C-alpha cells in the first residue's frame, strides 16, 4: 500500500496527538484499530490557537485521515476551563493587526483547518 502522509513523523509542539485503542463492547481493545485523539494544548490561554497550532491541527487531522487503522477522531483540549476560545488574541495584536496581507494568509490556513476538521 502507498503511504499518503505528507511527512513521515512530526514532533507536535502546540497540540497533543495520541492513538488510543478502539474498545469493544466489553471494554477490551480491538486489535489493530484505533481512535486518534487531537488535543489543543494551551490551557493557560484557554486553548486559544496560534498560527503554529493551526498548522499542526491541519497536519494531525490529515495524518489521522490517512491512517487506515484509525476509525474515529476525538478533538479535545487540555485543562478544565475551556475547550477553545478561538484565535490567540496576543498573536493577532502583535503580528496580524495592521498587516492585512499576512492576515489574509492566516485566514487561508484557518479555512484549511476548518475543512480538515469537517472532512
Give the location of each predicted region.
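Conserved CoA-thioester-binding segment of acyl-CoA-metabolizing enzymes
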Residues: 1-78, 101, 112, 116
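A structure-centric feature marking long, well-folded core domains of fungal metabolic enzymes
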Residues: 43, 91-93
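Short, flexible active-site-adjacent loop segments at beta-strand->alpha-helix junctions, enriched
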Residues: 79, 89
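Flexible, gly/ser-rich surface segments that form the specificity/activation loops bordering the active-site cleft
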Residues: 82
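Short helix- or helix-capping micro-motifs
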Residues: 85-87
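A short acidic, glycine-rich active-site loop
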Residues: 94-108
Amino acid at each position: 500500500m502507498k503511504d499518503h502522509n505528507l511527512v513521515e513523523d512530526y514532533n507536535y509542539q502546540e497540540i497533543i496527538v495520541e492513538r488510543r485503542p478502539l474498545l469493544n463492547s466489553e471494554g477490551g481493545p480491538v486489535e489493530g484499530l484505533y481512535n486518534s485523539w487531537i488535543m489543543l494544548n494551551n490551557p493557560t490561554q484557554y486553548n486559544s490557537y496560534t498560527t503554529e497550532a493551526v498548522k499542526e491541527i491541519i497536519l494531525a487531522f490529515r495524518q489521522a485521515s490517512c491512517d487506515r487503522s484509525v476509525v474515529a477522531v476525538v478533538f479535545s483540549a487540555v485543562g478544565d476551563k475551556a475547550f477553545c476560545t478561538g484565535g490567540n488574541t496576543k498573536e493577532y495584536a502583535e503580528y496580524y493587526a495592521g498587516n492585512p496581507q499576512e492576515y489574509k494568509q492566516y485566514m487561508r490556513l484557518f479555512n484549511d483547518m476548518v475543512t480538515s476538521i469537517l472532512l
